[in-house]
């Protein structure tokens, strides 16, 4: 008899363009979520539709505590629970079901417990098979030279291209497994335990469902015997390159709590009713709805240009085939040597990339699709709601610059920033602060594909400056005591430091001496896995200070979200932000709207600017933060507030590598950046690993010697990080 969880949920339907009540039945043994228009219809067996859970992915909205999604069979189904607790119950039960059936899908049903030695042996064997395959691949060229028929030539070329794609996937898999093995060994020596993200020789011990499903009959509990991670009789080349995604829910963390909408009737419960008879034989090959009224994201796969094809073999197992480009080859990994070896090349060709960060680069749009199998493997090791701060991400998804340098792009329009102090009226200064703030985000995105900047090393510094458009060569007096002492007093200067590693906190400061304006901020980035998305909470605040008026504008930052991480990733901002000036009483509320799944536009913002003690705003703003924003004033005037498409981006200026200190961002990451530029992923990974190992070694040394880390340019002041020598302090000292 099937063991079942049943209860009400709301489901989004395209027909009604809204939420509709449905009665859901989760069959744990069959791996099927069926739904009915009512409980009575369920009693009569009149099923409205069903969702297959084998290979499914659960997603949550970080800003809504009641909704969740299930993505499977190239469709995304949207559900809404009564509240956060109800959603938690369903998600946990669904995760357990998905995990169970995904393990079955992978054929991991043996009691063999692998060791690191077994793993290393299979890895070496896999590398040997890979070498044989590479040698055989060369024969295609001989075939093509001897082939005279066009039709036969096309067939050989197609076969060669497909084989190339497979070889590249296997290369990525071997590299990732080697890294996992090395990190697992290092962490076992350091901590006496194995990292969650790298379970090389760990044994997954499934746990019974949490209290909500504690009443489930005993036959539904996953078998207690250890689960084999790699069947010994399988040849390495037959191992799955990209395992079907599964969110591990055996250590479930609470999902985000935020205001949700909609309703859901009484709580779900677990029963084992006799009136429901769902055997595994009744599980359809694809999820379906009788009226096909379910909402699904049609662009979930088509954006990548190569939709995954799901094949069902005679045994009922599923696999995902993806197309990948073979144009960017990797060096063959050597499994007999550690990836910690030093780079033989590196800095001699530094001029090739010294200024590349100042250019947009869309040439890598295909790299995410190319490495999709590695991303799928990585995501299969993390669980929903998991904090990703300590997760080591694959090198190829990195953007070629540090996070500290990305923060510098807040000042890509330095003329807007310094013009704040030019305004004579406090009302106009507040409007100008909002204008600069809303213009500050679009320049931070380089290229059409979202990538992740480097995690800064503790103590890392980034320095740069901007020359204002109206600056003349006569303004040559240097700001010798400023953050960038080799530039003129009319320039906007910027400095950033990674002041903490755990938690990751960056502090940055900017100023313009002649305009008597400065900016100080700190941001703690906290990332979270949301299923098909990754959310980054930017915790912290900034302060714009107009020194001539003794005004300080406190502002907060929106959260960032990486969407469609399995196809073509894109970034959106979300959350409510505020700007307040305590001296003048002016304030602004700004909302970055995330795209709703049931329609709507991307990148929308709305903002209201208020006068002191007024509840009604004198200026309303709406538009897109990376496009055009329009302002409507209480006087009836309508105008373009900011047009980021027409605003010229002023390039930041950075010292050449040979002039930088060792701990400056571009100098620290030069080997990683260079190898990413030439697409040598192995060498980039080695260089990145050396930096991380050096940081760990320094941390161990400080711990052994009981030495506290001392920051270079910033100090902690309450809950904020403040620049040691701000313009305000220097001007005050000069008066005395």
From Swiss-Prot:
Molecular function (Gene Ontology), one example: sterol transfer activity
Cystine bridges: none
Primary location: membrane
Protein origin, superkingdom: Eukaryota
Sites bearing Phosphoserine, chain numbering: 306, 324-326, 329, 611
InterPro entries on file: OSBP_sf, Oxysterol-bd, Oxysterol-bd_CS, PH-like_dom_sf, PH_domain
Subcellular location: Late endosome membrane; Golgi apparatus, trans-Golgi network membrane
Keywords per UniProt: Acetylation, Endosome, Golgi apparatus, Lipid transport, Lipid-binding, Membrane, Phosphoprotein, Transport
GO biological process, any: bile acid biosynthetic process
Tissue specificity note: Widely expressed.
Family: Belongs to the OSBP family.
Protein name: Oxysterol-binding protein-related protein 9
Organism: Homo sapiens
């Amino acid at each position: 008899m099937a063991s079942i969880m049943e209860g009400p949920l709301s489901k989004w339907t395209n027909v009604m363009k809204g939420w509709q009540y449905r009665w859901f039945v989760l069959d744990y043994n069959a791996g099927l979520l069926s739904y009915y228009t009512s409980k009575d219809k369920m009693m009569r067996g009149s099923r409205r539709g069903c969702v297959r859970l084998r290979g499914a992915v659960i997603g949550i909205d970080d800003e809504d505590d009641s909704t969740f999604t299930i993505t499977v069979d190239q469709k995304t189904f949207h559900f809404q629970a009564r509240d956060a607790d109800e959603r938690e119950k369903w998600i946990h039960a669904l995760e357990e079901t998905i995990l169970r059936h995904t393990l079955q899908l992978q054929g991991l049903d043996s009691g063999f417990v692998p060791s690191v030695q077994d793993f290393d042996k299979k890895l070496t064997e896999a590398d040997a098979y890979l070498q044989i395959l590479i040698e055989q691949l060369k024969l295609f060229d001989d075939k093509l030279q001897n082939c005279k028929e066009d039709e036969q030539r096309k067939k050989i070329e197609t076969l060669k291209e497909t084989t190339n794609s497979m070889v590249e996937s296997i290369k990525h898999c071997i590299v990732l497994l080697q890294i996992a093995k090395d990190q697992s060994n290092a962490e076992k020596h350091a901590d006496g335990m194995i990292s969650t993200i790298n379970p090389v020789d760990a044994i997954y011990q499934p746990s019974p469902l949490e209290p909500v499903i504690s009443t489930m009959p005993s036959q539904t509990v996953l078998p207690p015997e250890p689960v084999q991670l790699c069947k010994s009789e399988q040849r390495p080349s037959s191992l799955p390159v990209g395992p079907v995604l599964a969110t591990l829910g055996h250590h479930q963390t609470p999902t985000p709590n935020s205001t949700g909408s909609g309703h859901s009737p009484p709580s779900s419960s677990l029963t084992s009713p006799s009136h429901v008879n769902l055997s595994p034989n009744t599980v359809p090959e694809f999820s379906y709805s009788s009226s096909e009224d379910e909402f699904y994201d049609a662009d979930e796969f088509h954006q990548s240009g190569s939709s995954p094809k799901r094949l069902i073999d005679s045994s009922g197992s599923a696999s995902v085939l993806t197309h990948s480009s073979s144009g960017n080859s990797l060096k063959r990994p050597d499994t007999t040597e550690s990836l910690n070896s030093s780079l033989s090349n590196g800095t001699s060709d530094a001029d090739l990339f010294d200024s590349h960060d100042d250019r947009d680069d869309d040439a890598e749009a295909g790299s995410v699709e190319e490495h999709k199998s590695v991303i799928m493997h990585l995501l299969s090791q993390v669980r929903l709601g998991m904090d990703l701060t300590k997760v080591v991400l694959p090198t190829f998804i990195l953007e070629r610059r540090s996070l500290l340098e990305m923060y510098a792009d807040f000042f890509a329009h330095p003329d807007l920033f310094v013009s704040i102090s030019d305004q004579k009226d406090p009302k106009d200064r507040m409007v100008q602060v909002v204008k600069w703030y809303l213009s500050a985000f679009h320049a931070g995105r380089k290229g059409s594909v979202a990538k992740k900047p480097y995690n800064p090393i503790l103590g890392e510094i980034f320095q740069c400056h901007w020359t204002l458009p109206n600056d003349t060569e006569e303004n040559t007096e240097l700001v010798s005591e400023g953050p960038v002492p080799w530039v003129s007093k009319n320039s906007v200067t910027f400095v950033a430091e990674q002041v903490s590693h755990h938690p990751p906190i960056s502090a940055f400061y900017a100023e313009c001496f002649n305009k008597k304006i400065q900016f100080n901020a700190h941001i703690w980035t906290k990332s979270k896995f949301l299923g098909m998305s990754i959310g980054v909470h930017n915790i912290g605040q900034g302060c714009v200070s107009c020194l001539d008026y003794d005004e300080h504008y406190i502002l907060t930052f929106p959260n960032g979200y990486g969407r469609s991480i399995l196809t073509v990733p894109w970034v959106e901002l979300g959350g409510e932000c505020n700007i307040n000036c305590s001296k003048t009483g002016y304030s602004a509320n700004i909302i970055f709207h995330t795209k709703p799944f049931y329609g709507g536009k991307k990148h929308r913002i709305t903002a209201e600017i208020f006068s002191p003690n007024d509840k009604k705003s004198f200026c309303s703003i709406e538009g897109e933060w990376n496009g055009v924003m329009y302002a409507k004033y209480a006087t009836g005037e309508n105008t373009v507030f900011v047009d980021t498409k027409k605003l010229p981006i002023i390039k930041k200026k950075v010292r050449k590598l040979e002039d930088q200190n060792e701990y400056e961002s571009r100098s620290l990451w030069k080997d990683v950046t260079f190898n990413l530029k030439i697409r040598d992923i192995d060498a980039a990974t080695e260089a990145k690993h050396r930096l991380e190992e050096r940081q760990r070694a320094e941390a161990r040394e400080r711990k052994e010697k009981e030495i506290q880390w001392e920051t270079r340019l910033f100090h902690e002041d309450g809950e904020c990080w403040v620049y040691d020598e701000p313009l305000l302090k220097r001007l005050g000292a000069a008066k005395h």
